Curated annotation (Swiss-Prot):
InterPro entries: Ribosomal_bL19, Ribosomal_bL19_CS, Ribosomal_bL19_sf, Translation_prot_SH3-like_sf. This protein is located at the 30S-50S ribosomal subunit interface and may play a role in the structure and function of the aminoacyl-tRNA binding site. One of its GO terms (cellular component) is cytosolic large ribosomal subunit. This is Large ribosomal subunit protein bL19. GO terms for biological process: translation. It comes from Acetivibrio thermocellus (strain ATCC 27405 / DSM 1237 / JCM 9322 / NBRC 103400 / NCIMB 10682 / NRRL B-4536 / VPI 7372) (Clostridium thermocellum).
Amino acid sequence: MDIIKAIEQEQLKKDVPDFSIGDYVRVNVKVKEGNRERIQAFEGTVIAKKGSGISETFTVRKISYGVGVERIFPVHSPRVAGIEVIRKGKVRRAKLYYLRERVGKSAKVKTKLE
């Protein structure tokens, strides 16, 4: 089992920023279109984080043209070019799934004042 752990440690990204649930983030994703590759940004609120180590994932939710869109990203994926924390959020829950039923102002997360 030590060989598996060693390979997993080798694959971990070193430059992952410290972000938590409720933060508003911009995730830069590498998208392959035909024979060229470009970077596409996905901005939204982090509503969940799961797992640890190489299998750690987080869910980002945004509203696009009045429709809620959620994407699950592996933190250490080579497809994720970068994660930027735009705004820190102040929440008291580990999972913000209740935001799925909220619309408008009630779906906002308070900003953490540091």
